[in-house]
């Protein structure tokens, strides 16, 4: 068993112990300051840290530290930020690179070419119309992770919670690495956190693949009202927040977990104007919403458990009244009302602005207001809201203001080294995803509490987190032990082979980053090296060291 597999086993054991020990609403939510100098934190300990990182990783050979490169511009490499504006699009390479970084899981030469050929606006529109993008090549890859595509009934027929969790994580990351629907995948990640369901909660594991497919992926650019109703009826959500057990018959008090989280997290927000009376009214309204059975049942309404409570005698929820509706129809009506609420529009627009523009954005900013208006004008449609944000001057000016979270960083590394898919190594990838992202603190779909993984950079830049990133970069430069032809340094460094170490560094930077290294990164590498930029290039083993250093730089931590 490999180290990665041992770490995956430890993670699964820890997850299983948590299943019965904690309610998803019992754990205190994360809170942290957003005041943070991103570049300073990313650069960390500089050259010493880079050298220590290389020494700490036992799966790659100790690198011969490269130095300041001699400027080169091989014709086989993608254009750099210094390239003049394209005569066809009139857009600078810097903005094309910004779009590729921010709206994908990492730029590749092929992606940069595609964006330049289409123009950024057309490319964004193509990505938002994700169903029209031919991504059939992913079918063969996902076939290696069949549980990610199964129904709860199929999973229950051969129950293996651990394998289901592993395959869901691997399928999620595989789509990020090799999929063509890059913006859709980023939005899937966003909505998976907004409507968070912890896959490690024992009751939800078998239902999460269906929730991922029929709620999150289906509506990622559609109407939020439809997504919210689908989520409220999702067996995964109903079990995660105990709604499946909520009954208000015979004098019983309904469970308030889902009602509270739906108001606070999914719709209007904690400052949305609701109070405890509203929470109780929503809990009564949704009493009887459940599933046919825990193992494989779909949504089922039990009228005998249902009680309209205070809403039956003139109550209201933020201005909504049932007007004679009861049961499922009343619950759906409230959910659609809340999806259309102005507070929900502003909150969703703000969260998406933080995700795609940066933490400096405020809820009262014009860019948020414009996106909220697009959402409202299109009856809660998500795509127009996202488009408003991505075509804004604020988005264009936000280059370098977002850090890659661990999943994004992991996927970007394997996209950077142009790892080729090998079905024979599907299990290895699954173990690697689980072990490495566990170390980095972001296993897909595994955040314990209903608020989803944090979206502020300070959470991801502790000293331990940065060391783990540097170690991951060294592992990634070795493609986690993947043999050729999965990994080929020539694909990254180009042909003919570099003449000097400096030449190799420059080529690696252009291929991985899409632009030259910053002076500060070059200086950090130089300080850990006794070489010069004219040191002759020796063997392909050096390529992994050069690639590792470029992957470790602050530029590669930024979206």
Residue ranges of predicted features:
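N-terminal secretory signal peptides
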Residues: 1-36, 47-54
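Short, low-complexity, disordered segments immediately C-terminal to signal peptides
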Residues: 61-76
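Active-site substrate-binding loop specific to GH73 endo-beta-N-acetylglucosaminidase modules
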Residues: 42, 46-50, 204-421, 557
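N-terminal accessory alpha/beta regions
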Residues: 109-210, 215-217
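Flexible, low-complexity segments enriched for small/polar residues
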Residues: 78-92, 97-109, 341, 345, ...
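Extracytoplasmic/secreted proteins, especially bacterial periplasmic and envelope-associated proteins
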Residues: 91, 95-102, 110-114, 118-126, ...
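A general structural motif at alpha-helix termini
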Residues: 45, 116-119, 128, 142, ...
């Amino acid at each position: 068993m490999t180290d990665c597999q041992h770490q995956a086993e430890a993670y699964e054991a820890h997850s299983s112990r948590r299943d019965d020990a904690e309610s998803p609403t019992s754990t205190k939510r994360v809170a942290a300051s957003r005041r943070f100098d991103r570049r300073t934190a990313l650069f960390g300990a500089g050259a010493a840290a880079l050298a220590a990182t290389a020494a700490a990783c036992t799966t790659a050979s100790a690198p011969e530290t490269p130095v300041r490169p001699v400027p080169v511009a091989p014709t086989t490499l993608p254009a750099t930020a210094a390239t003049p504006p394209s005569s066809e699009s009139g857009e600078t390479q810097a903005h094309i690179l910004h779009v590729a970084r921010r709206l994908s899981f990492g730029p590749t030469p092929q992606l940069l070419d595609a964006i330049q050929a289409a123009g950024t606006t057309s490319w964004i529109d193509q990505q938002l119309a994700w169903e029209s993008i031919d991504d059939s090549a992913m079918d063969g890859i996902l076939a290696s992770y069949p549980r990610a595509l199964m129904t709860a009934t199929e999973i229950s027929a051969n129950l293996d919670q651990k394998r289901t969790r592993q395959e869901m994580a691997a399928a999620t990351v595989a789509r990020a690495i090799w999929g063509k629907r890059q913006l859709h995948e980023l939005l899937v990640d966003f909505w998976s956190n907004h409507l968070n369901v912890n896959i490690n909660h024992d009751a939800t594991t078998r239902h999460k693949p269906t929730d991922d497919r029929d709620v999150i992926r289906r509506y990622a650019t559609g109407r939020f009202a439809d997504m919210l109703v689908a989520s409220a009826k999702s067996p995964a959500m109903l079990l995660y927040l105990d709604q499946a057990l909520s009954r208000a018959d015979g004098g019983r008090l309904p469970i308030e977990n889902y009602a509270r989280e739906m108001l606070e997290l999914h719709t209007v927000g904690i400052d949305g104007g609701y109070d405890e009376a509203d929470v109780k009214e929503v809990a009564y309204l949704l009493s009887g919403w459940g599933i046919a059975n825990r193992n494989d049942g779909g949504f089922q309404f039990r009228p005998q458990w249902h009680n309209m409570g205070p809403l039956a005698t003139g109550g209201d929820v933020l201005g909504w009244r049932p007007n004679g509706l009861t049961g499922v129809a009343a619950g759906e009506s409230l959910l659609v009302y809340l999806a259309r609420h102005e507070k929900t529009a502003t909150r969703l627009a703000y969260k998406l602005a933080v995700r795609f523009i940066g933490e400096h954005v405020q809820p009262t900013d014009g860019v948020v207001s414009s996106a909220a208006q697009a959402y409202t004008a299109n009856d809660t449609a998500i795509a127009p809201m996202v488009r408003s944000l991505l075509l804004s001057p604020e988005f264009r000016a936000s280059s370098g203001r977002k850090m890659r979270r661990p999943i994004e960083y992991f996927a970007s590394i394997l996209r950077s080294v142009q790892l080729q898919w090998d079905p024979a190594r599907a299990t290895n990838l699954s173990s690697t995803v689980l072990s490495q992202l566990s170390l980095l603190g972001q296993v897909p779909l595994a955040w314990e509490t209903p608020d989803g993984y944090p979206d502020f950079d300070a959470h991801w830049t502790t000293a331990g987190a940065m060391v783990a990133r540097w170690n991951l970069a060294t592992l990634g430069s070795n493609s986690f032990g993947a043999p050729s032809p999965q990994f080929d340094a020539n694909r990254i460094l180009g042909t003919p082979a570099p003449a000097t170490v400096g030449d190799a560094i420059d080529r690696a930077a252009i291929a991985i980053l899409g632009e030259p290294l910053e002076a500060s990164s070059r200086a950090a590498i130089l300080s850990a090296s006794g070489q010069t930029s004219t040191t002759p290039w020796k063997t392909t083993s050096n390529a992994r060291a050069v690639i590792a250093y470029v992957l470790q730089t602050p530029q590669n931590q930024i979206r």
